[in-house]
Amino acid sequence: MNRLMIVSLLGIATALGGCVNPPPKPNDPYYAPVLPRTPLPAAQNNGAIYQAGFEQNLYDDRKAFRVGDIITITLNEKTQASKKANSDIQKDSKTKMGLTSLFGSGMTTNNPIGGGDLSLSAEYGGSRDAKGDSQAGQSNSLTGSITVTVAEVLPNGILSVRGEKWMTLNTGNELVRIAGLVRADDIATDNTVSSTRVADARITYSGTGAFADASQPGWLDRFFLSPLWPF
């Protein structure tokens, strides 16, 4: 019995351990810096003022609009959510059956052991009651900045940007990743844009090391918080 219990606990620990998300790794190719697809031609030392390939429109600014350009995204994320659910289910039932006659004859007879007459009658009842109450709340805030590169320019002029930032601390690494779509008109003159202006944003803030491990519940805690716990 003890051996079976140990094997069962090891199986549960293994299953719950497999449900843990693997820690992020640096140098993800998807978030690697994107270089310009067409390199600028080499400048010619011919003494001319105009150099082919280096021209710029008189009304252009220095805002990013090409593949490989750099944009700084200011993180201003704040979310708050709450959820509450109540349920109450109750069911009562009662049934009574009695036969007083059969083919015109009475169904009561003298009880041979005393205590009154006997009759073919039955009565039963039942009651069920189930109640549930759940409440969840979550609040997140993320501020800071991250510099990314333009990965693609869509036909309508929308910029697809992505990038990551790794910070190595004494006790581990901190990671910020972001990817999304930016409208060129939302970019300020200093090549910055708020994260609230990034469409289809994918923002990841994670880390590795002692602090990240301390915030993760143990395998036994995950079992009690998982749907496998029957109570």
From Swiss-Prot:
Keywords: Bacterial flagellum, Cell outer membrane, Lipoprotein, Membrane, Palmitate, Signal
Membrane topology: Lipid-anchor
GO cellular component, one term: bacterial-type flagellum basal body, distal rod, L ring
GO molecular function: cytoskeletal motor activity
Major subcellular site: membrane
Gene Ontology BP terms: bacterial-type flagellum-dependent cell motility
Origin superkingdom: Bacteria
Lipidation sites (N-palmitoyl cysteine): 19
Intracellular or extracellular location(s): Cell outer membrane; Bacterial flagellum basal body
Covalently attached lipid (S-diacylglycerol cysteine), positions: 19
Signal peptide: 1-18
UniProt entry tagged with the keyword Lipoprotein: yes
PROSITE patterns: PROKAR_LIPOPROTEIN
Ranges where the record places region Disordered: 118-141
Family membership: Belongs to the FlgH family.
Role, per record: Assembles around the rod to form the L-ring and probably protects the motor/basal body from shearing forces during rotation.
UniProt subunit comment: The basal body constitutes a major portion of the flagellar organelle and consists of four rings (L,P,S, and M) mounted on a central rod.
Name this polypeptide is given: Flagellar L-ring protein
Organism: Pseudomonas aeruginosa (strain ATCC 15692 / DSM 22644 / CIP 104116 / JCM 14847 / LMG 12228 / 1C / PRS 101 / PAO1)
Gene: flgH
